[in-house]
From Swiss-Prot:
It comes from Trichophyton verrucosum (strain HKI 0517). Keywords: Mitochondrion, Transit peptide. Belongs to the RRG9 family. Residues 82-105, 198-316 are annotated as: Disordered. This is Required for respiratory growth protein 9, mitochondrial. Residues 241-263, 272-290, 302-316 have a biased composition (Basic and acidic residues). Residues 291-301 have a biased composition (Basic residues). Required for respiratory activity and maintenance and expression of the mitochondrial genome. InterPro entries: NGRN/Rrg9. Disulfide bonds: none annotated. It is found in: Mitochondrion.
């Protein structure tokens, strides 16, 4: 086959033929494609010396339909079709833009959100509530839940309804040791507040000289009163039971075995209704009067009791 190179004169004819091949009306074969190109190529004198050994004709396998379509598409001048690529970000945005059904919030959640926007600290109240106050809140609510509702208790104690709701919901109770420690801490806080008030001139009493009982004394009194109430059946506690907490004075009998017996010793029983005028008795009376004077100065009520009869009771 002679050499028939492409020149500027016949390039438009080749391109026109390739464009017509993009939309063929009849099946295109390899032989017809090569013959059509060879018929439209005009030989040039400049390339006559080009031998046929250097020319390799274009060949497409007969059974390669996919390769033929790829060859036609590579020589076509039509612009390629644009394919829209959907990225992962677009899918995530499309999913997030879907409106979700909103559930109605409870009243406490609405109030919590409103407080968070206004005070930037949520429902947390500024006021500290003592453990005794919390216990009284629970007691009032258990007595009458309608009268002492969450709203009424919040208005009464000046705290938020959410705090009241959490206090009523909590079931934790402190042990006796924890309660003692808590009361001691509250006692220290009370003393600190009193000292601050004294510095400001709002209080004139000394907080250290407090007459309030300590936490241990309060708990012991509560324990004693609860036990006495449980034991009583409509009667007052016995005298011995009431004097359990009072320290009693131990009476130790005198040991008179070592003393010598004096037959002339006079007791108070011997002096009742008798009169003796001898000198020894007068001296003893003078000494006894001095002792009585000193004892009257110490114990004035004892003399009043001695002057009366033994059956009467004093007026103190």
């Amino acid at each position: 086959m002679s050499s028939q190179p492409l020149t500027a004169a016949n390039i438009f004819a080749v391109l026109r033929h390739l464009r017509s091949l993009c939309h063929p009306t009849r099946p295109v074969t390899t032989a017809s494609f090569a013959s059509s190109i060879a018929s439209q190529i005009i030989p040039s004198q400049a390339y006559n010396n080009y031998t046929s050994t250097h020319y390799t004709p274009l060949s497409i396998p007969k059974n390669g339909a996919l390769k033929q379509l790829h060859f036609v598409a590579s020589y076509s001048t039509a612009p390629p079709a644009k394919t829209e690529k959907v990225t992962a970000e677009d899918t995530s945005l499309s999913k997030s833009t879907k409106p979700k059904p909103k559930k109605p919030l409870p009243a406490w959640a609405v109030q919590k959100n409103a407080l968070k926007e206004k005070f930037k600290e949520g429902w947390k109240p500024r006021k500290k509530v003592s453990p005794d106050t919390m216990e009284s809140i629970r007691k009032l609510h258990s007595m009458d839940s309608v009268k002492f509702s969450t709203k009424n208790l919040a208005e009464e104690f000046k705290i938020s309804p959410e705090a009241i709701r959490r206090i009523l919901k909590s079931k934790w109770r402190a042990t006796e040791a924890e309660e003692i420690d808590r009361r001691n801490r509250w006692e220290k806080r009370k003393i600190r507040i009193q000292e601050q008030m004294m510095e400001l001139g709002l209080r004139h009493t000394d907080p250290t000289s407090k007459g309030d009982p300590s936490a241990e004394e309060v708990l012991s009194q509560r324990h004693y009163s609860s036990n006495s109430i449980e034991d009583l059946s409509g009667e007052y506690p016995s005298q011995n039971r009431r004097r359990e907490g009072i320290p009693q004075k131990r009476i130790v009998p005198e040991d008179n075995s070592s003393r010598r017996f004096d037959p002339w010793e006079v007791t108070a029983d011997d002096l009742l209704g008798t009169k003796r005028d001898y000198a020894g008795d007068n001296c003893a009376k003078e000494d006894s009067s001095k002792v009585r004077r000193s004892s009257t100065q110490r114990h004035p009520r004892r003399i009043e009791y001695n002057e009366r009869s033994y059956k009467e009771k004093p007026d103190w």
